Amino acid sequence: MPRNVELEHNSAVPEHVHAITLVRHGRTAYNAQHRLQGQIDIPLDEVGQWQVRQTADALRELYVDRRPDIPNRLVICSDLGRAAATAHAFADPLGLEVHPDIRVRERSFGDWEGIPVEELAQRYPEDYRSWA
């Protein structure tokens, strides 16, 4: 379920910004296997596809059905497929354009990407402890 973060009135925030909602992508096979995926472009699995449909319904209800007076809605996502699929599940039925942006991409974990977290803890115990 998306977390709604309402912005307090702040001179640094433009008047027209009503809310910013951050939504994590749906589950992937790597998530289910507890593998560190980082910037490897792993697609959503069946559970992840179901999750994004449910999240899209909740977002539509929260931000469109209950607040039809807000004219501008902007959907920004990572350029990775799992994030784009999540964004499109909400945006496409509403005719909203999705703006992929590499600046919101998952961070890189370098050589750790694709390795199960449990294996990382065993192979690199000191590094893993400082990271986790």
Language model features with spans:
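Non-catalytic terminal regions with compositionally biased, polar/charged low complexity
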Residues: 2-16
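Active-site-proximal alpha-helix that buttresses catalytic centers in soluble enzyme cores
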Residues: 2-5, 24, 29-94, 123
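Structural motif
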Residues: 12-15, 67, 99
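Extreme N-terminal starter segment of soluble prokaryotic enzymes
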Residues: 14-21, 73-74
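Residue-level recognition of specific faces of alpha-helices
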Residues: 19-22, 32, 130
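Short, positively charged
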Residues: 20-25, 111
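General small-molecule cofactor/ligand-binding pocket signal
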Residues: 21, 76, 99-101
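Phosphate-handling substructures
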Residues: 93-132
